[in-house]
Swiss-Prot record:
Record organism: Arabidopsis thaliana
Listed InterPro entries: ZFP36-like (IPR045877), Znf-CCCH_4 (IPR041367), Znf_CCCH (IPR000571), Znf_CCCH_sf (IPR036855)
Region named Disordered: 1-32, 46-81, 211-231, 299-335
Regions of compositional bias (Gly residues) in chain numbering: 212-231
Protein name per UniProt: Zinc finger CCCH domain-containing protein 12
Biased segments, Polar residues type: 50-60, 309-329
Keyword Kinase found: no
GO biological process, one term: regulation of DNA-templated transcription
GO MF annotation: an example: mRNA binding
Listed Pfam families: zf-CCCH (PF00642), zf-CCCH_4 (PF18044)
Biased amino acid composition, Low complexity: 70-81
């Protein structure tokens, strides 16, 4: 009977043979499934003794784990690894390789299992006790401290942001200045505007020139009659050029509107009855807010377009003795030699034509083609 002794202080399992060794012609029963290696045996052999493989990447690679232990822990791990290799050598070629019988063994001569019966070795009789003691030692039952891999926490760095704390940098500029921001009404979008709002450019001193009628001039030394130029007061920086009786009595800076301020009806207000810009809208919300081009409210007109101010009309008696009156045409209106055409137009628009004053743009209602077919249809009557 053989006696086996395990040296606890070393890293090698010593098997002491007795005087009665097993016979050399030991042939196991090939029909016994315990003689053939299983898939678990292959995995266990790889884990215990990976050096005997051919290194063809069929087994798991021998990688170094992240956060490897210190030198003392590495020594303990190395000792446990040596014991594992010793046990693996104890079971070297103690089973037949089933992959070699199938012709698919990748390890060839480096296989841990026997490819022939002649290579087969008998395991020690007490191999179960040796394996159990090794497993108990690995689990920490015999006082050997288990090696616990402590993962070192990774230090995280926050990438600094280049965005400044000002409100200007919060907007995504498109590289252009906001046009509405520099007007007197200001930008209706405020901080949500995607264009640049430059306060320094807005506060720069500039001279505003308005071309319009007289009545809008304001200045410290402006006179009455003709165009008024504001230049008497030191604080005035508005120059108004216009024609008309303007009385300059203001002493401060006059806020001027654009020349096309509220000269048209707001489409949004006219269709929906609501405008998001409100009083800051550049278009008129109703006929009461409608202005002339250059400034000034438009005078209310009647249903037929007659101006309520009677002194704006100049009438003369018809030279042919007709009872109706005709108005003097404006200098820019061409005259036609056809008397019937003039008579028809004069009878139909006697009250709508207004003499044009300097600096005032008149608004007249166009009533469509009035008997325009007679111009092209008279020649038919002449032929007949």
């Amino acid at each position: 009977m053989s006696h086996h002794r395990r040296d606890s202080g070393g890293d090698v399992v010593h098997v002491i043979p007795t005087n009665n060794p097993p016979p050399d012609n030991w042939f196991p029963n090939l029909g016994d499934s315990a003689v053939w290696a299983t898939e678990d045996d292959y995995n266990r052999a790889w884990a215990m003794n990976p050096d005997n493989t051919s290194g063809d990447n069929n087994g798991p690679p021998n990688k170094k784990t992240r956060g490897s232990p210190s030198s003392s822990s590495a020594t303990t791990t190395s000792a446990a690894s040596n014991r594992t290799k010793a046990i693996g050598k104890m079971f070297f070629k103690t089973k037949l390789c089933c992959k070699f019988r199938a012709g698919t063994c990748p390890y060839i001569t480096n296989c841990n299992f026997a490819h022939t019966v002649e290579e087969l070795r008998r395991p020690p009789p007490n191999w179960q006790e040796i394996v159990a003691a090794h497993e108990e030692e690995r689990s920490g039952g015999m006082g050997t401290p288990t090696v616990s891999v402590v993962e070192i926490p990774r230090e995280e760095f926050q990438i600094p942001s280049l965005v400044s704390s000002t409100a200007e940098s919060g907007r995504s500029f498109k590289g252009r200045h906001c046009k509405k921001f520099y007007t007197e009404e200001g930008c209706p979008y405020g901080e949500s505007c995607t264009f640049l709002h430059d306060e320094a450019s807005r506060n720069r001193e500039s001279v505003a020139i308005s071309l319009g009628p007289g009545g809008y001039g304001s200045g410290g030394g402006g006179g009455s009659g003709g165009g008024s130029v504001g230049g008497g007061g030191s604080s005035s920086n508005v120059v108004v050029l216009g024609g008309g009786g303007g009385s300059g009595s203001g002493s401060g800076i006059q806020i001027l509107k654009p020349s096309n301020w509220k000269t048209r009806i707001c489409n949004k207000w006219e269709i929906t009855g609501y405008c998001p810009f409100g009083a800051k809208c550049h278009f008129a919300h109703g006929a009461a807010e409608l202005h002339r081009f250059g400034g000034g409210l438009v005078e209310e007109e009647g249903k037929d377009g007659v101006s309520p101010n009677p002194d704006t009309k100049q009438t003369v008696q018809n030279p042919k003795g007709l009872s109706d009156t005709t108005t003097l045409l404006s200098p820019g209106v061409p005259h036609n030699a056809d008397a019937s055409y003039h008579t028809g137009v004069a009878l139909q628009r006697a009250s709508s034509a207004v003499t044009q004053k300097p600096g005032i743009r008149t608004h007249q209602k166009w009533k469509g083609p009035a008997k325009i077919s007679r111009i092209y249809g008279d020649w038919i009557d002449d032929i007949e």
